[in-house]
């Protein structure tokens, strides 16, 4: 994912500081210098970086800290909070309401992925029960209407545009009026992409905004734009009332620091990020979990939300029961592999787990991991019900393994590798035995600590250290929020554990 290199550099700087015997002014300055260098290399604006390090030094006054304070944790928390502050201007964005027509206007640079993002935004809300519609007011780019028409047709979203009308203001007004009559409650207007220096296109954008009176103007920004991001974003903010930002191409290899700068320039929150070309590669942006994932600290709440999306409600109680019993079969492993594949790109899923930073799951390895899961599932398709439902690995004799290999078209050693993976996951699952899962909204401090103790047995030592020991794990447990009752989904999906 984009910004992965930045996250890795900051994580390493914090890790080096954590490994120091004594935390003094010299160690703190070395850590901040490394973080500063990483941010500047990632194209974050100099003033933002300077202000961030100044604020951290004000917060972390080593001379004023009492002997009992954990200096490492205070520094780590200060870095975390300052990164969150860069990405969060502190003001909420407009939220459309179902049943009441809302007009959302999209603006952005040429090539930022604006038209595709319009459709993703519409598709996301359509799945949540809105009745969206798309209006193509981009008369500048050849093929713009064709692209929007193709995307909208694929997503089954109504659209409006014209091959003959050249006035974008008229198209926008007519489209909005048409969809208001059809009782659409989310009308999305796509405008022409532009550059900062194109005065005529900016004037056109202002006219479209004045005529349609949008409830929200969204600035779409390509994460790879680099140093120019701040100036470009500011130019849009000065022309129209930008109220939110969507950052695209977050799956690329670009530095991506410009994304941080754009938020500062527009003083508007990031509401979504685009993580790929497909319609479902579009995530709601939440600052703290994002920074947590960026630094390799995981995002439990996001992970649990993913589980909520893919595990059918009728299967959830059964899964929790099996978890509390520590009973793990090949069938359960198969079902959890299915859930992982439904969650989306596997690297995205693993980045939500503490210790699985983008460096530990590099981009080239994501497809390999996904392919391995699919191979395992193919082998399990050749198993009998008795084999799938047994929790006794000794049942898998040599003759059974050879039969499964032949039936699935795989090698014997591949089936044996799969069985080793099963044993490893079964070992993790067994450690979850007896885990008490409180009902929604009933996570007391005591039960959270008990769950953290169980989790500390499951996590590999290296991962537990990276989170910040038991204290850090307890903090992560707090993040789980309303998704705590779904913690059982973790058992079969976890990629870590003792070999």
From Swiss-Prot:
Oligomer status and interactors? Component of a signal recognition particle (SRP) complex that consists of a 7SL RNA molecule of 300 nucleotides and six protein subunits: SRP72, SRP68, SRP54, SRP19, SRP14 and SRP9.
Entry protein name: Signal recognition particle subunit SRP54 2
Kindly list the GO CC terms recorded for this protein.
cytosol; endoplasmic reticulum; signal recognition particle, endoplasmic reticulum targeting
Source taxon at top rank:
Eukaryota
Entry's Gene Ontology molecular function annotations? 7S RNA binding; ATP hydrolysis activity; endoplasmic reticulum signal peptide binding; GTP binding; GTPase activity
| Reaction catalyzed | GTP + H2O = GDP + phosphate + H(+)
Give the Gene3D superfamilies listed for this entry: P-loop containing nucleotide triphosphate hydrolases, Signal recognition particle SRP54, nucleotide-binding domain, Signal recognition particle, SRP54 subunit, M-domain
The positions annotated for binding GTP are 108-115, 190-194, 248-251
What organism is this sequence from?
A: Solanum lycopersicum (Tomato)
Ordered alphabetically, the record's keywords are: Cytoplasm, Endoplasmic reticulum, GTP-binding, Hydrolase, Nucleotide-binding, Ribonucleoprotein, RNA-binding, Signal recognition particle
């Amino acid at each position: 994912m984009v910004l992965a290199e930045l996250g890795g550099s900051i994580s390493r700087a914090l890790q080096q500081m954590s490994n120091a015997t004594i935390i003094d002014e010299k160690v703190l300055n070395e850590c901040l210098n490394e973080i500063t260098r990483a941010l500047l290399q990632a194209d974050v604006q100099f003033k933002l970086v300077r202000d961030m390090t100044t604020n951290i030094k004000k917060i972390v006054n080593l001379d004023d800290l009492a002997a009992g304070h954990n200096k490492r944790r205070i520094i780590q928390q200060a870095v975390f909070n300052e990164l969150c502050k860069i990405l969060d201007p502190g003001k909420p964005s407009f939220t459309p309401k179902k049943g009441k027509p809302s007009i959302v206007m999209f603006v952005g640079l040429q090539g930022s992925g604006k038209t595709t993002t319009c459709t993703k935004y519409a598709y996301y809300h359509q799945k949540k029960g809105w009745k969206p519609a798309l209006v193509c007011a981009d008369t500048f780019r050849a093929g713009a209407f064709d692209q929007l028409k193709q995307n909208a047709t694929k997503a089954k979203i109504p659209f409006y545009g014209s091959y003959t009308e050249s006035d974008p203001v008229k198209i926008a007004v007519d489209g909005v009026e048409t969809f208001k009559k059809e009782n659409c409650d989310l009308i999305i207007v796509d405008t022409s992409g532009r550059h900062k220096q194109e005065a005529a296109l900016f004037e056109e954008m202002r006219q479209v905004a004045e005529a349609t009176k949008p409830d929200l103007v969204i600035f779409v920004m390509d994460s790879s734009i680099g140093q120019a991001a701040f100036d470009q974003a500011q130019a849009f903010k000065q022309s129209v009332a930008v109220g939110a930002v969507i950052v695209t191409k977050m799956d690329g290899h670009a530095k991506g620091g410009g994304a941080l700068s754009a938020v500062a320039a527009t003083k508007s929150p990031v509401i979504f990020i685009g993580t790929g070309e497909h319609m479902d590669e579009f995530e709601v942006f939440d600052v703290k979990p994002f920074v947590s994932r960026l630094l390799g600290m995981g995002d439990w709440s996001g992970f649990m939300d993913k589980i909520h999306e893919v595990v059918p409600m009728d299967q959830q109680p059964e899964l929790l029961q099996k978890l509390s019993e520590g009973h793990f079969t090949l069938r359960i492993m198969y079902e959890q592999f299915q859930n992982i594949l439904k969650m989306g790109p596997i690297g995205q899923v693993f980045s939500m787990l503490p210790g699985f930073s983008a460096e530990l799951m590099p981009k080239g390895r994501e497809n390999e991991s996904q392919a391995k899961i699919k191979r395992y599932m193919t082998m399990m398709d050749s198993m009998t019900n008795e084999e799938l439902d047994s929790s006794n690995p000794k049942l898998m004799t040599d003759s059974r393994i050879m039969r499964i290999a032949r039936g699935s078209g795989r090698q014997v050693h591949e089936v044996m590798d799969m069985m080793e993976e099963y044993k490893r996951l079964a070992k993790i699952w067994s450690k979850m035995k007896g885990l008490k899962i409180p009902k929604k909204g009933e996570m007391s401090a005591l039960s959270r600590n008990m769950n953290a103790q169980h989790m500390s047995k499951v996590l590999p030592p290296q991962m537990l250290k990276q989170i910040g020991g038991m204290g850090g794990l307890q903090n992560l447990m707090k993040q789980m929020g309303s998704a705590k009752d779904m913690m059982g989904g973790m058992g079969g999906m976890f990629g870590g554990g003792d070999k």
